[in-house]
């Protein structure tokens, strides 16, 4: 049986009930608090026998990115392959060429509002597109591609506000399964995980992309996204990778 990730073209669906259409946003991976908790009331306990109502659907290309929903827009990443085949190649790296795209749709109608595309050759295992869900913060949307290309775009028109190639900036290699740790907005900071000596976790000014702090050392960044928790009255930034789990002060990057 084919999965949505092995089909040549997937479809982005918006499945709604009347009450859901006016409920809260889901602006990043695992929701507003990154806890996978939907706080709205009146949700269906089970779908009707005929299935949920599909309000609209649009075709998207390759990728593993989930949708982010905020301020009447749906944001998703995909990968438009121009050369090669995205063979799984477990344990090895497959070379293909294409463009990563950040796409914005009207959440009520599915109308495409804008697309930002850039060249992104891959050399990865399972090279079928970006892994990370966009993160929306006000009028800014952040995306991280499978080869570590980070962008900050305007949610209004897709204009590039700043961008950063994590591999070049921090002199690291792509993990074999690609950069998969979803970016996390914490106050005025954007937290990312490049990996490497002293740069396993990095905080950037979310408006400019300038580095604020860097912390920890690891061979690879791992695949777990950064998580913000509050414990004992103190905010803690949890960073997990293949060698350790650390709790950092999110403002300074110091081990707490």
For each of these PLM feature ranges, what is it?
Residues 22-256:
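Noncatalytic, solvent-exposed loop/strand surfaces
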Residues 2, 14-15, 46, 161:
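Intrinsic low-complexity, intrinsically disordered segments enriched in polar/basic residues
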């Amino acid at each position: 049986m084919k999965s949505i990730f092995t089909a040549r073209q997937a479809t982005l669906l918006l499945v709604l009930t009347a009450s859901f259409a006016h409920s809260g946003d889901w602006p990043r991976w695992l929701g507003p608090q990154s806890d996978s908790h939907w706080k709205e009331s009146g949700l269906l306990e089970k779908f009707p026998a005929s299935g949920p109502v599909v309000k609209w659907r649009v075709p998207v290309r390759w990728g593993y990115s989930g949708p982010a929903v905020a301020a009447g827009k749906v944001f998703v990443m995909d990968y438009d392959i121009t050369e090669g085949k995205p063979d799984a190649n477990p344990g090895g790296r497959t070379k293909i060429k294409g463009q990563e795209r950040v796409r914005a749709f009207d959440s009520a109608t599915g109308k495409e509002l804008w697309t930002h595309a850039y060249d992104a050759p891959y050399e990865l295992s399972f090279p079928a597109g970006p892994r990370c869900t966009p993160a929306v913060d006000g009028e800014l949307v952040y995306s991280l591609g499978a080869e570590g290309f980070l962008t900050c775009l305007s949610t209004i028109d897709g204009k590039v506000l700043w961008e950063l190639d994590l591999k070049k900036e921090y002199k690291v290699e792509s993990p074999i399964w690609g950069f998969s740790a979803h970016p996390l907005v914490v106050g005025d900071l954007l937290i990312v995980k490049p990996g490497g000596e002293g740069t396993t976790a990095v905080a950037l000014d979310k408006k400019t992309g300038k580095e604020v702090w860097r912390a920890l050392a690891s061979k690879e960044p791992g695949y777990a996204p950064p998580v913000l928790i509050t414990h004992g009255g103190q905010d803690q930034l949890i960073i997990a990778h293949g060698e350790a789990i650390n709790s950092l002060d999110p403002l300074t990057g110091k081990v707490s």
